[in-house]
């Protein structure tokens, strides 16, 4: 429940776009590229074409497997973003690109499964993370760390994005009808105890 609360609470301030009245709305996308596109050129090309069509102002990405900061910059340039940041260059990095300058506020690995990246762009604080895929108790600790970080730093105009490895209430009916998924989730939790 804390994950949903966390997302809901910090999305509210940006529903008004976080910008002065009269400005256009901000277009933001959070996207999991699934294991660095698995080195599949056609998946990468399809992603770039789709992103070009969406024209986001800000794009957060998870699972930037195999990406360096330079690689992320190259990808960003292919859909028109000049600014980018990545939390790390090994494992399963998270990153963000923007059509406006980015200021990196914090890159944190400690306490996070894949890391937490905090940047400022478009006048907003943007946090990108990828929570534990295996252990709900660890995810809960990560969510609590995010909540504390946001409160301690008084981030009033903040958006948290990424892969929370949690199902939305919208998915509940689907999850309940797929026994194998439920079995897998229970198995993963048991393996972590």
Predicted regions and their residues:
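N-terminal, active-site-proximal structural segment of metallo-dependent hydrolase catalytic domains
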Residues: 4, 16-75
């Amino acid at each position: 429940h804390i994950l949903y609360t966390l997302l809901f609470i910090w999305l509210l301030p940006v529903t008004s776009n976080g910008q002065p009245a009269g400005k256009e709305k901000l277009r933001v996308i959070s996207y999991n590229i699934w294991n660095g596109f698995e080195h599949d050129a056609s998946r990468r090309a399809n992603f770039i074409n789709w992103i070009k069509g969406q024209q986001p102002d800000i794009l957060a990405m998870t699972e930037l497997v195999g990406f360096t900061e330079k690689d992320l910059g190259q990808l960003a340039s292919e859909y028109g973003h000049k600014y980018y940041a990545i939390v790390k260059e090994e494992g399963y990095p998270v990153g963000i690109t923007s059509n406006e300058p980015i200021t990196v506020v914090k890159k944190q690995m400690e306490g996070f499964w894949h890391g937490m990246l905090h940047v400022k762009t478009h006048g907003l604080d943007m946090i990108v993370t990828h929570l534990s895929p295996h252990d709900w108790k660890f995810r809960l600790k990560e969510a609590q760390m995010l909540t504390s970080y946001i409160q301690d730093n008084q981030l009033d105009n903040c958006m948290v994005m990424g892969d929370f490895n949690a199902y939305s209430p919208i998915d509940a009916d689907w999850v309940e009808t797929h026994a194998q998924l439920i079995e897998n989730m229970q198995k993963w939790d048991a393996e972590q105890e």
